[in-house]
């Protein structure tokens, strides 16, 4: 596929909601990001700042945000120790995700989630669907597992400094950085 072919495709921006919000949660200070009722908002602020930058820079035709629903996915059922070593999600973070989903809804940005699948599974499905429909996908995530999805019409925008800097991973960038093709990138 030529660069011109790719440039003429509609663009869908796929956001890994929890991944981006979690990065913002740890990148920004909580001071000054609290409502009068005590609700923390700094993860949402960082997420929306990144989204604003992405919309300005990438000019997507469509945007979808995928979120995790918890620990009841098929992986947890098949392998109970799946992600068992992870620390408990801070309570200050949980409330911010629901607030962020409300803001995205108000902005007209659809959100998807599933009790059976993680957000990155949903993003993989959406990316493949977009490709089959003649679109190109930009996936914004801090999850390197998504590098396996990269091809001539799928690019991963990976945050490297909190929520302010994104690295564009294409097949060439994956090969340059890791000396493997996206399909060879370990899961």
PLM feature spans:
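Short linear sequence elements within intrinsically disordered, low-complexity coil regions
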Residues: 27-30, 52, 79, 84-87, ...
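Intrinsically disordered, low-complexity N-terminal regions enriched in serine/proline/glycine
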Residues: 25, 46, 61, 78-81, ...
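Non-catalytic, usually N-terminal nucleic-acid engagement modules in DNA/RNA processing proteins
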Residues: 1-64, 68, 74-76
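Short acidic, glycine/serine/threonine-rich loops at helix termini
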Residues: 24-27, 75-80, 149-154, 170
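Extended two-metal-dependent nuclease catalytic cores across DNA- and RNA-processing enzymes
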Residues: 2-8, 33-34, 84-187
